Curated annotation (Swiss-Prot):
Family matches, as PANTHER family: DNA-DIRECTED RNA POLYMERASE I SUBUNIT 2
Keyword Nucleotidyltransferase recorded: yes
Organism: Methylobacterium nodulans (strain LMG 21967 / CNCM I-2342 / ORS 2060)
GO terms under biological process: DNA-templated transcription
SUPFAM superfamilies: beta and beta-prime subunits of DNA dependent RNA-polymerase
UniProt keyword terms in alphabetical order: DNA-directed RNA polymerase, Nucleotidyltransferase, Transcription, Transferase
Entry's EC annotation: 2.7.7.6
UniProt-recorded name of the protein: DNA-directed RNA polymerase subunit beta
Subunit text: The RNAP catalytic core consists of 2 alpha, 1 beta, 1 beta' and 1 omega subunit. When a sigma factor is associated with the core the holoenzyme is formed, which can initiate transcription.
Gene label: rpoB
Keyword Kinase applies: no
Protein family per UniProt: Belongs to the RNA polymerase beta chain family.
Top-level division of the source organism's lineage: Bacteria
Described purpose of this protein according to its UniProt entry: DNA-dependent RNA polymerase catalyzes the transcription of DNA into RNA using the four ribonucleoside triphosphates as substrates.
Length: 1374
């Protein structure tokens, strides 16, 4: 048999017509790349670039003290090796992190008291420990306090400038009020907005508004400059009694003349009154040589003066810039002999007087007043001085410490406003603010468009690295304050950097982020798909994001720019819909945080293989064809008109205008949606449910890849890290259930070990208590290539994702048992463990040191029978492999009791028998109700300095043996490889020296070498210097490798023997893991991949299930009425194709059996050729072919990729090839009567999942249990072992039936009548059935509440009231 079968254990029949060009990026690249870029653990050549952690340190350091006599500089940072590896952290419940060491330099200056000149007095450098920095595991997760967590990426509004209007909601007239907002990455927001009167206002940080001109004054402009910035000017020159005004064809285009337009020079009428000046006529007038028109005084009235009109000799001001020209002003100007009046070019149509009007209403007219105004808005109640006001204004927008646009913000701003500031300019400039106001005024004038804030060019992704960077910066800033204070208070000449720094704030910021941030989530680890999806999730919630309540419909909706970037299907149902999304399959995040998707370039109508990644902004200007556009064999687009997307619209263009083309039809959906075959035939709502429910599928005992898949299964299995891929190519040396040893064959680097040991996980508990277990796929001696799958994990089979099982389905009603989506199952499913899953529950108990003495873990428990202790060892801990049930003891523990006053009898007994017998109580760890299972693992943790018990020592010995075995195996392979290389060098040589007994100059042969022990081979010396050098190098490397192996082993053993870090006051901790086997049962939830979910209603004996002509019974019966209204027809197509797959599988099985009998592979090859293409089978030997055929017995797996899969005709062809009816329907017989059903029934194989909503986890009953402290009513919920609430409506029901006594018990003895319920219990124990209800505790609570409000409420019992009446004097009674 050939040895390279790995990776070909299963071949899928592929239906896709469209060739895939682009490689799908690694699915968890988003997480890994982001965090790697933040940490940059290995310093690149030439130092680290200024990003990530480096930029954080650079931005906070250097720190100087208040008197500038000392400076603390940042030099570099390094990471040390983490103290524990990932598995140790998981077991010990600690964080997987590496110590961060920062090199700091303290420079002390001498300051000359007279001149103030500084000279360096002392420089000290030191490495300072700055806390531990969590590291990411291979799979893109973090281990925090022993649990796996994922940091979800956040979608937020990109920094930059945005223009918007209020959609006419603010003002009753429905007028659009435009607004601009500059959003920095951190710092103050600046809003510029119009009000209903068209005055422009500015707001800083959503505070009180000020006229925008005040802001411009504060920037250093004066009124005239402001007007000249926003308006052009026109000069009116006196010409006799009238005025001359220059003629500008562009400006007057579209102008309607109210009076005749007259040429100022010739006096001719160029345009008659009432006519409109078209672009053509305006141009013709200019061509005639008209340069100026005649204007009258009336034309000037109502215009605005463009500059201050001043008599420079006398200083008299005739008019200020912005003044409106009135008859009086015009007359006044004429009187002083002014011949030329500059006016602002405002025509109230194309250019509005908004800035001029704002200037007119602004109380301020200079910089000082404006600064004071801004100061009063920002800090009300503080008296401003010019210095403080200036400093405050500067710090708002121009101080890099406080204001950061970020590179993204700067790029976006430059693009939107056509500016050319460099990326490094992270603060605002005067030009930026002016450009924003200008753009806003242009919008009001009807030029330009507002921004769409849901466009993916305006939303960006913050991944782990960036979130962490912001958090760490906050921590360092807190630290900076403390450092400054400490620098001032200590003797700076004698201290080292270490003494100035307290790293707690920085470490606390990190801890807080990973422990309690909204974006740091407990990983969804139900199955490999749910892990991958969780890491690819994008959330709009979280700090700095939206809140559920505030998010409107637009934010949640699907946007055209989502195409290929965010999945339109996968999002939760419920309040988070649309706020939590998933990245599309090919999407990636670029350095600016925008999501990019790949396209193929199209040149002159020919599609190339060049792939480009574009963000939503870049894509907008191209014509993009679909991946399914028709091409000929030269890849030329064949259709006359191609359907394309451009800027969110769908249009039809000629092939030569197409710029780009999608790389794959599945690039618009997420990973989960891409796993649904025939997605294109499902309604979107059901596809959403299908995507979400695949993530809840429980890993089953036997994984079974789907007959009808999409080809994505292997990608998910590999990238999720569930299945193990070979790190290097090599030959399998050893295999057992717990590890695989591979000898690397292509390793040339002598410093690396020549062997890879892969440890397989066995029965580990996931975050969701599902079972993680891996099993090998390779055999000893097989050749393995790099990246080949060598072991399956949970929910994977042959390296493919396998979330459920293929079952034979019949779509028909069956006695009402599949009414309303219920599911009817055959008993075979239970008997053959088809849907059986293993769940691992973890229980832990701690022995603490209490005030009354230490708790003790022991087998010696008071008042417990020997029967109850049968599963415990001598240390009081349960054995591995024991079967336990609810209430069984897992770990025996006793706690000292408090001293209680002794009765005389006790004193007597104590005097007779000495020490009191039971001063301890039993606080053992017991199995909670509803759990039955097998103990699979026990871990014992001891505090430093506490003696280990026998159990802990046994566990430690086992672990050390396992480590020693690994070391010995690696050593053996090292020996074998090294000595084989040494033999190759020595054989054929005639050494001049050798070990004892060797005659020199004898030519060595392999047999001759074998006479000497291998360790003596190094003693041979040959003449050839080159060979000698090689042998010496080999020996040195061999010794080093041996030493390394031994050291690694000793380190691990030392860690094992060291005490554990336990919480304060805990002496010992025991964790017990129980494996629970859950068979499927009525009440469990199941689903297909198309959103077809239901609850198991009944499990029917096999003989009663409907059966086919050949006697095969259906496994599952679904209701056909669940299909039409839900419009998820994909499940029917899947059923048909699954039926064909099973039919073909039977044919292949027959051919394989024939081959095994006759050893003639021709019929088998023919059969396989009918199914697969030639290329897939080429080069396979007969034996390999038979092995692959053997894997196809149950069914031939197919792949039908989304939007590119099998069509109806393909399915029919497959059914025909399998010798089945083209309709996909069969005659079924009733299992109970043996009669055929009236009509043919759709029968086939469908892929069903068992979801993580198991009836065992939900069903619950209570008799006696805990009560709430205040109200004394039973608690609610399964976790609290609570009762069922009998609420207001239930009381109405009992009232309606007049069930008075039942109602009374419900409200008293079954709830919160404390004395009554005790009496009932005693009565039931006595066998008595009479009891009396008392006063419910909640009534007392009500009375107390009323008393607390000052109303004294007292109860008067009826007997006492009657007596009082009798004894009272007559007047009192009245």
């Amino acid at each position: 048999m050939a040895n390279t079968l790995v990776g070909r254990k299963r071949i899928r029949k592929f239906f896709g017509k469209i060739r895939e060009v682009a490689e799908m990026p690694n699915l968890i690249e988003v997480q890994k790349a982001s965090y790697d870029q933040f940490l940059m653990v290995d310093e690149p050549e030439g130092g680290r670039p200024d990003e990530g952690l480096q930029s954080v340190f650079k931005s906070v350091f250097p720190i100087s003290d208040f008197s500038s006599t000392a400076l603390l500089e940042f030099v570099k940072y390094t990471f040390e090796a983490p103290k524990y590896d990932v598995d140790e952290c998981r077991q010990r419940g600690i964080t997987f992190a590496a110590p961060l060491k920062v090199t700091l330099r303290l420079i002390v200056f001498d300051v000359d008291p007279d001149t103030g000149a500084k000279s360096v007095k002392d420089i000290k450098e030191q490495d300072v420990y700055m806390g531990d920095m969590p590291l990411m595991t291979e799979n893109g997760t973090f281990i925090v306090n022993g649990t796996e967590r994922v940091i979800v990426s956040q979608m937020h509004r990109s920094p930059g400038v945005f223009f918007d209007h209020d959609k006419g909601k603010t003002h009753s007239s429905g007028k659009l009020l435009f607004a601009a907002r500059i959003i920095p990455y951190r710092g103050s927001w600046l809003d510029v907005e119009f009000d209903a009167k068209d005055i422009v206002y500015a707001r800083i940080d959503r505070k009180r508004k000020i006229p925008v001109t005040s802001l411009l004054f504060a920037l250093g402009l004066d009124g005239e400059e402001i007007l000249s910035t926003f308006y052009n000017r026109i000069s009116y020159t006196r010409d006799g009694a009238d005025w001359r005004v220059p003629y500008d064809a562009e400006r007057l285009k579209g102008f309607k003349a109210s009076t005749d337009l007259i040429d100022a020079d010739s006096g001719e009428v160029v345009l008659e009154a009432g006519k409109k000046l078209t672009a053509r006529s305006a141009r013709q007038i200019a061509e005639k040589g008209v340069t100026a028109l005649r204007a009258t005084d009336e034309d000037l009235i109502g215009q605005y003066i463009a500059e201050d009109m001043v008599n420079y000799k006398t200083g008299e001001i005739y008019a200020e810039a912005g003044d409106e020209i009135s008859e009086k002003l015009l007359k006044g100007l004429a009187d002083v002999g002014i011949e030329e009046i500059p006016v602002l070019d405002i025509d109230h149509v194309n250019v509005g007087p908004y800035i001029r009007n704002t200037l007119a209403v602004d109380k301020n007219s200079n910089r000082e007043g404006a600064l004071f105004d801004i100061y009063r808005v920002m800090r009300p109640g503080e008296p401003p001085t010019l210095d403080t006001a200036e400093a405050m204004f500067h710090s708002l927008f121009f101080d890099a410490e406080r204001y950061d646009l970020s590179a993204v913000g700067r790029v976006k701003m430059n693009m939107r406003l056509d500016l050319d500031a460099p990326d490094t300019m992270r603060t605002l400039r005067r030009d930026d603010m002016l450009a924003v106001v200008k753009a806003l005024v242009d919008l009001r004038d009807g030029k330009g468009e507002i921004d769409d804030i849901d466009h993916l060019g305006n939303r960006r992704v913050r991944s782990v690295g960036e979130l962490m960077e912001n958090q760490y910066r906050l921590g360092l800033l807190r630290m900076e304050r403390a450092i400054k204070e400490r620098m001032s208070s200590v003797d700076i000449d004698t201290v080292m950097p270490q003494d100035l720094i307290n790293a707690k704030p920085a470490a606390a910021a990190v801890r807080e982020f990973f422990g309690s941030s909204q974006l740091s989530q407990f990983m969804d680890q139900t199955n490999p798909l749910s892990e991958v999806t969780h890491k690819r999730r994008l959330s709009a919630l979280g700090p700095g994001g939206l809140t559920r309540e505030r998010a409107g419909f637009e934010v949640r909706d699907v946007h055209p720019t989502h195409y290929g970037r965010i999945c339109p299907i996968e999002t939760p149902e419920g309040p988070n819909i649309g706020l939590i999304n998933s990245l599309a399959t090919f999407a990636r995040v670029n350095k600016y945080g925008f999501i990019e998707t790949p396209f193929r370039r199209v040149k002159n109508g020919v599609v190339t293989d060049e792939v480009v990644y574009l963000s939503a902004m870049e894509e907008a200007r191209y014509y993009v064809a679909q991946a399914s556009a028709a091409m000929d064999e030269n890849r030329r687009l064949t259709e006359d008109l191609v359907v394309c997307r451009r800027a969110g619209e769908v249009i039809v263009v000629a092939p030569d205008r197409v710029d780009l083309m999608d790389v794959s039809p599945k690039q618009l959906v997420s990973v989960a949606a891409a796993l649904i075959p025939f997605l294109e035939n499902d309604d979107a709502n059901r596809a959403l449910m299908g995507s979400n429910m695949q993530r809840q599928a429980v890993p089953l005992v036997r994984a079974d890849a789907p007959f009808v898949g999409t080809g994505m299964e292997s990608v998910v299995a590999r990238d999720s890290g569930a299945a193990i891929a070979a790190r290097r190519s090599g030959i399998v040396d050893q295999v057992d259930a717990t590890r695989i040893v591979i000898r690397a064959t292509e390793e040339t680097d002598p410093t690396k070990p020549g062997v890879d040991i892969y440890r397989l996980q066995k029965f580990q508990r996931s975050n969701q208590s599902t079972c993680i277990t891996q099993k090998p796929l390779v055999r000893v001696g097989e050749q393995v290539g790099k990246g080949d799958i060598i072991a399956d994990g949970p929910s994977t089979e042959f390296g493919e994702l396998a979330l459920g099982r293929n079952v034979l389905v019949a779509f028909m009603p069956w006695n009402g048992y599949n009414f309303e989506d219920s599911i009817l199952l055959s008993e075979r499913i239970v008997k053959d463990d088809v849907f059986t899953s293993i769940h691992i529950e973890e229980f832990e108990v701690m022995a603490r040191d209490t005030k009354l003495g230490p708790e003790e873990i022991t087998r010696d428990i008071p008042n417990v029978s020997e029967e109850a202790l049968k599963n415990l060892d001598e240390a009081g801990i349960v054995y591995i492999g024991a079967e336990v049930h609810a209430g069984d003891i897992l770990v025996g523990k006793i706690t000292p009791k408090g001293e209680s006053p002794m009765t005389p009898e006790e004193k007597l007994l104590r005097a007779i028998f000495g020490e009191k017998a039971s001063d301890v109580r039993d606080t053992s760890l017991r199995v909670p109700p509803g759990v039955t299972g097998t103990i699979v693992e026990v871990r014992v943790f001891n505090r430093h300095g506490v003696d280990k018990d026998e159990r802990a020592q046994a566990i430690e010995r086992e672990e050390i043996e396992r480590l020693a075995k690994d070391r010995d195996d690696e050593q053996a392979i090292l020996d074998r490889n090294t000595y084989a290389r040494l033999a190759d060098v020595l054989v054929g040589q005639a050494p001049v020296a050798g070990p004892k007994g060797f005659k020199k100059d004898t030519v060595l042969t392999r047999e001759g070498l074998a006479d000497y022990p291998r360790s003596q081979w190094w003693q041979f010396a040959v003449v050839d210097d080159r060979l000698m050098t090689e042998i010496e190098a080999m020996q040195k490397q061999y010794d080093e490798s041996k030493k390394r192996l031994e050291q690694r082993f000793l380190d691990k053993v030392e860690k094992l023997q060291r005490g554990d870090e336990l919480p304060p006051g805990v002496m010992k901790m025991v964790k017990v893991f129980v494996a629970v086997k859950r068979k499927i049962q009525p009440g469990d939830k199941m689903a297909g991949r198309h959103g077809n979910k239901g609850v198991v209603s009944r499990i029917v004996p096999i003989e009663d299930m409907p059966f086919l002509e050949d006697g095969t019974h259906a496994d599952i019966v679904l209701n056909p009425l669940g299909v039409p209204s839900r419009m998820n027809v994909g499940q029917i197509l899947e059923t048909h194709l699954g039926w064909a797959a099973a039919g073909l599988g039977r044919q292949v099985a027959q051919a394989v059996d024939a081959y095994l009998r006759s050893h003639d592979a021709t019929p088998l090859r023919e059969q396989m050729r009918r199914i697969y293409s030639e290329a897939e089978l080429d080069g396979l030997s007969d034996q390999d072919l038979a092995e692959i055929g053997n894997n196809l017995r149950r069914g031939v797996p197919m792949a039908t990729p989304v939007f590119n899969g099998a069509k109806e005709a393909d399915i029919e062809a497959m059914l025909e090839m399998a010798g089945l009816d083209r309709s996909g329907q069969s005659t079924l017989y009733d299992g109970r009567t043996g009669e055929p059903f009236d009509r043919k029934v759709t029968v086939g194989y469908i892929y069903m999942l068992k979801l993580h909503h198991l009836v065992d986890d939900k069903i619950h009953a209570r008799s006696i249990g805990p009560y709430s402290l205040v109200t004394q009513q039973p608690l609610g919920g399964k976790a609290q072992f609570g009762g069922q609430r009998f609420g207001e409506m239930e009381v109405w029901a009992l009232e309606a039936y007049g069930a008075a006594y039942t109602l009374q018990e419900m409200l008293t003895v079954k709830s919160d009548d404390v004395a009554g319920r005790t009496k009932v219990y005693e009565a039931i124990v006595r066998g008595d059935d009479t009891f009396e209800a008392g006063i419910p505790e909640s009534f007392n609570v009500l009375v107390k509440e009323m008393r607390s409000l000052g109303l004294n409420v007292e109860l008067i019992s009826s007997k006492r009231a009657a007596n009082d009446q009798l004894e009272a004097p007559p007047e009192a009674a009245e």
